[in-house]
Amino acid sequence: MSLGTVVEVIGAVVDVEFPRDSVPKVNDALKLVDSDLVFEVQQQLGDGVVRTIAMGTTDGLKRGLKAENTGHPIQVPVGKKTLGRIMDVLGRPVDDAGPIDAEETWAIHRKAPSYEEQAGSQELLETGIKVIDLLCPFAKGGKVGLFGGAGVGKTVNMMELIRNIAIEHSGYSVFAGVGERTREGNDFYHEMKDSNVLDKVSLVYGQMNEPPGNRLRVALTGLTMAEKFRDEGRDVLLFIDNIYRYTLAGVEVSALLGRMPSAVGYQPTLAEEMGMLQERITSTKTGSITSIQAVYVPADDLTDPSPATTFAHLDATVVLSRQIAELGIYPAVDPLDSTSRQLDPLIVGQEHYDTARRVQQTLQRYKELKDIIAILGMDELSEEDKRVVTRARKIQRFLSQPFFVAEVFTGSPGKYVSLKDTIKGFQGILAGEYDDLPEQAFYMVGSIEEAVAKAKTL
């Protein structure tokens, strides 16, 4: 393979000069001689010089060092040997459990499946979380986004979904930690270990303290491992926490690569980078990838270019709201803002659809009446509106639920509620069967029977 020389180092971006007749291709991996450091070629600048991003810290790099062209993109181990292991962006183990003797390695840059290979699915994926199953149901092989500002519970929701689906679903999962807290990665590992599902999960981490090159590519590393499981004919779950940090890593290197920034300082290639990742997360005729992605919303502004670009790719959006978190209702899902393509009578059935829409109508009416209540008080409302308000407040509380992964903090055991029980409970509240129960009985319970039992103790 050809040898090049480092000619310039600016932060994470390194320029390497090669002989004119053997210039590396874009996306090829270069390896620093006598070191583990890997670079990925981003641009060819002419005169044999290529501009690269370092997949590791560039501390101590200097001009004149030699780098060799591997002749192929970054290759990572795939297959069953990756299960139960924690890896970095290059597929190297970071859990001190010995090498990963994978039979196969795949390049992290791949083409998305063609039109002929793709397959749609109408099958629902039950999560055991009432508000999600009722109002924004997930499709098997679909893409879901968890949107929320700082501290409204994206990661806790994500961990609960993983726990519920991984245990109930019994397939393989891949978790890509993109620019998140190392503590969360550690908690997550132990959570999986304690739930005895670690041997079904591959973990790929590029945490907050990593250089931008790692955070920019770690999502692709996780996705490549998921694609391998899918191409073996499995239904695989892909969790990405957090898509926003993927965009942010692109912002960090974009200016260093010499690109002009676009709106709000984002990279001009934002839509393309997002599309290249998202289009590969899809189901084929051999197997499916169901993906659940956490999306940080800067300053709670859903119109920011990063979350706005992500919206276009998703089948279901779960919006976590600060106003609902302030009421102490967790999961803090906004029932009026969250949407799903699956909420269609032809897919979920008429009964489920009607219940979900009536829940939303009741909550919407309550929202409209709030101003009147604030100024004139409840007594000025008509009897019909009073009923709507009391039922809406019960629905609001019944949408909360204790989580398994939060047991250590809350002290109350987690609850998994089947879709059948969820629909039955909300139908009962809407029909007025539980008008005599106090609001507090509906707060942080699983099924409606628990609410009835709780009312007796109040």
UniProtKB/Swiss-Prot annotation:
User: Which EC number(s) does the record attach to this protein?
Assistant: 7.1.2.2
Q: Which of the seven top EC classes does this enzyme belong to?
A: translocase
Task: Give compartment(s).
Answer: Cell inner membrane
Q: Is the keyword Nucleotide-binding in the record?
A: yes
Residues holding ATP: G148, G149, A150, G151, V152, G153, K154, T155
Keyword annotations of the record: ATP synthesis, ATP-binding, Cell inner membrane, Cell membrane, CF(1), Hydrogen ion transport, Ion transport, Membrane, Nucleotide-binding, Translocase, Transport
Topology versus the membrane: Peripheral membrane protein
Q: Which SMART domains match?
A: AAA (SM00382)
What is the predominant subcellular site recorded for this chain? membrane
List the record's Gene Ontology CC terms alphabetically: plasma membrane; proton-transporting ATP synthase complex
**Keyword flag Ion transport:** yes
What is the reaction catalyzed? Answer: ATP + H2O + 4 H(+)(in) = ADP + phosphate + 5 H(+)(out)
What does this chain do? Answer: Produces ATP from ADP in the presence of a proton gradient across the membrane. The catalytic sites are hosted primarily by the beta subunits.
Similarity annotation = Belongs to the ATPase alpha/beta chains family.
Q: How does it assemble?
A: F-type ATPases have 2 components, CF(1) - the catalytic core - and CF(0) - the membrane proton channel. CF(1) has five subunits: alpha(3), beta(3), gamma(1), delta(1), epsilon(1). CF(0) has three main subunits: a(1), b(2) and c(9-12). The alpha and beta chains form an alternating ring which encloses part of the gamma chain. CF(1) is attached to CF(0) by a central stalk formed by the gamma and epsilon chains, while a peripheral stalk is formed by the delta and b chains.
Q: What is this protein called?
A: ATP synthase subunit beta
User: According to the entry, what is the taxonomic lineage of the organism?
Assistant: Bacteria, Pseudomonadati, Pseudomonadota, Gammaproteobacteria, Legionellales
Q: Which gene encodes it?
A: atpD
